[in-house]
Amino acid sequence: MHLTLAQMAVTALLVALLPLTLVWTSSDVSKYRKLVWVTVFLTFDLIVFGAFTRLTDSGLGCPDWPGCYGAANPFLAHEEIVAAEALMPTGPVTVFKAWIEMIHRYLAMAIGVLIVAMLAQAWYQWRRSAATPAGRRADYAPLIPTLLFFAVCLQGAFGAWTVTLKLQPVIVSTHLLLGMGLLALLVWYGCRQDQLITPARTLTASPPAMRRIRWLAGLSAALLLVQLALGGWTSTNYATLACTEFPLCGGELVPPMDFEHGFTLWRELGKTAAGHYLPFSALTAIHWVHRNFGLLLAMVAGYTAWRAWQHAALQRTARWLALTLLLQLATGIATIYLNFPLAIAVLHNAGAALLVLWLTMLNYQAKCQFELALATNATAATHAQHGRKDNTPS
């Protein structure tokens, strides 16, 4: 196992070497900022590829971890994979699925390497900036890179448990949620790097108006977190086609549903906690809750985008957020009516990751605008006070 892990680590280093080389040889003013955004891009790709892995039932394409039948890649395990496929032709193990699963693991480990590089550079800059003013030194604070490092390690652990616990729904759903959380943290950090280089200087709203935008953006992010959990639960329980019409489900607005078994977290895939087969009404409950909570999220996030659209500094992000919401609604409905086509299902997962990206950016931008509005008001008040003093007769 140790040899396999070492061989996979070397593969991950080689995969990570390409983006690292592109970053450090670029003419970008801030190579570190570019590294962060390249990692954001690759993490988004990993989430989409992870959805493809899950939707093609490739999660157990290599039923051990970290390698594939004890080997570092499917080439070295070809005989074992072919033998497993011959024993169960309709099972989860095929050469194609083995490669899908291992590519997913290689890319995940490469992103881990990029985050380690980010962390090392952040600590290096932090130590070098010891003699700078406290405010300037805070720019290099390595808190977020440290959180990213622990998050990617935890994500790797859940990736392993996804395989070793045979696609336990709660483990797979948590793995998906952690991936989205990692993306959000990376986007927040990327926005912070942008802010350090080109600070926001254009004030577009008063503090009360921007406070309302911040509240709406925060609420939308909280609702999105719940919806991501529900979407992951729907996918990992294979409940996508429990309702095959919209807005009705089984010919009813509120069909018969089994919430108790549907939302029991710790159980095997397709089974109740007692080990019986999961009733169809439980799958209906899972799908119905995800669908209707999605409509609630669309209304709240759509209203947030509309309010943010009225401020120039937030307009671009608000526009993309609104378009992504429409994409999600369209792909969600299309998934039902087109009998769950793979391309649409992957696109729906990509849309969820884009919602994470745009809402994280909107929250950060609203925060910066709010702080700028407060600072502008404070400066204006100070100038007014000095003006009154200057006009006071001596």
What are these regions (language model features)?
Residues 52-62, 150-176, 233-245, 329-353:
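Interfacial helix-loop-helix junctions of multi-pass membrane proteins
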Residues 55-102, 240-283:
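Extracytosolic (periplasmic/ER-lumenal) interhelical loops and adjacent juxtamembrane/interface segments
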Residues 29-45, 141-148, 204-229, 314-321:
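Interfacial segments of alpha-helical transmembrane regions
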